[in-house]
Design a protein with these regions (language model features):
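Two-component/phosphorelay signaling modules centered on CheY-like receiver
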Residues: 10-29
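Active-site residues of response regulator receiver
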Residues: 7, 52, 80
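Short, flexible helix-to-coil linker/hinge segments that flank and couple to helix-turn-helix
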Residues: 86-92, 103-143, 147-151
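Active-site beta3 strand of CheY-like receiver
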Residues: 44-50
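Short amphipathic alpha-helix used as the core "switch/output" element in two-component signaling
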Residues: 39, 61-73
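Receiver (REC) domain active-site loop signature in two-component systems and cognate sites
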Residues: 55
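Acidic catalytic/metal-coordinating carboxylates
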Residues: 33-36, 58-62
Length: 155
């Protein structure tokens, strides 16, 4: 599996690269903002782009939109500390493959493996909020969830 890590915290990038490389994952590049994410994605075409949301220059949401408009098959996994409803909704609307919280570092490797295998991955805390967000927002799109994911979300 070939990935790119994008995070404005250089220590996070470096640590993740070391940890994931030791697990056999090829980290082909790292970057610190959305502009670098776009450039590095075009250059390396990774299996997965692991990216933070709030960053300088271009944030992760805007970078993802640009990448997905040019490469609709791109597999983007957000790794963030932010649980904001706005970000969760935008992630689902644009079709990113996952949204996991940095506080749960143990789930990063399994999340990468699941996304690599074609699954969507959201932390339990995020999944449990989706039905409430859906009810609050009349136009909340769930088109990017398959029937099984929607079934699990509604439970």
């Amino acid at each position: 599996m070939k990935i790119i890590i994008i995070d404005d915290d250089k220590l996070v990038c470096s640590s993740l690269k070391t940890i994931l490389s030791s697990k056999g994952i090829h980290v082909c590049a790292t970057g610190n903002n959305g502009a670098e994410a776009i450039k590095l994605y075009e250059q390396h075409r990774p299996d997965i782009l692991l990216m933070d949301i709030r960053m300088e220059t271009i944030n992760g949401v805007d970078a993802s939109k640009q990448i997905l408009s040019s490469f609709p098959q791109a597999r983007i996994l957000f790794l963030t500390t932010f649980r904001d409803d706005e970000y969760i909704i935008k992630a689902l609307q644009m079709g990113v493959k996952g949204y996991i919280l940095k506080q749960n570092y143990d789930c990063i490797l399994p999340a990468l493996e699941a996304v690599y295998m074609g699954q969507n991955v959201f932390n339990t805390e995020i999944i449990t909020r989706i039905p409430d967000l859906w009810r609050q927002k009349e136009s909340f799109p769930i088109d990017n969830l398959n029937s099984r994911e929607m079934e699990i979300t509604i439970l």
